[in-house]
Amino acid sequence: MIAPEALKALLMNNQVIPVKFAGHRMLLDAGGVLLWPQQDLLIFSDLHLEKGSFLSQFANPLPRFDSKETLKRMHLMMQRYDCGHIVCLGDSLHDGNALSRMQIDDLERLNTLVDSVAKWTWILGNHDPDIPPEILGKRAPLLQIQNVLLVHEPEVLAIVNENAINENCALDSQHVPVEAQIIGHYHPKSSYKLANRKVTGKSFVCGDNILLMPAFGKYTGGLDINDKAFEHMFTRKSALVYLTYHQKIYLL
């Protein structure tokens, strides 16, 4: 885990902002990751590895180096926080054939990252409902940690809790109700007028019981937080938006 002195420096430099979500203290990093110190957990979302090679098949003039860059940035974030558990919130691969296009050294680099921590969980997404066995790590459709659900797309929590209660009754065990969820999928971005210019960046969005992660992948765009797609999750007035820009993070 990151040393207190190093964390203090990040906080003073506006690279990290502390938040309280679902009763837990967490840290949002300008690099697009979430740290849950109490759980020794670092969360990434929407890596979209091999998106460049996918698009280049359709005459899009994009270089095929996005996976290298994404993995390099992942390594830096992992070195920064030194957590024992990594969770990737779905769409880690851009498509079902991503592995066939991935360069051998990139696959080796990915597996080296996975093998460097005690636990690595791939949450499955709509782009990667199956992750090939050549990639190390555990697969799961969702993951509950205490009262928080980690999942790619938002779930109806009442249904999640009902299903869990039924399963736990069969096992004669006690269920901790899910009260909030951390999700990916939407690639939220926001904008802010600064002097004579407007800055736009990937963003975290924190509502009452839902926290949206920004996309981490190199070639991942964003959906403006004012888009109607977000209306069923939160209202703009009720949500806290954290804009990332040039390795800084700001509460709007």
What role is predicted for each listed range?
Residues 1-89, 94-252:
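Extended recognition/assembly regions associated with phosphoester-bond processing machinery
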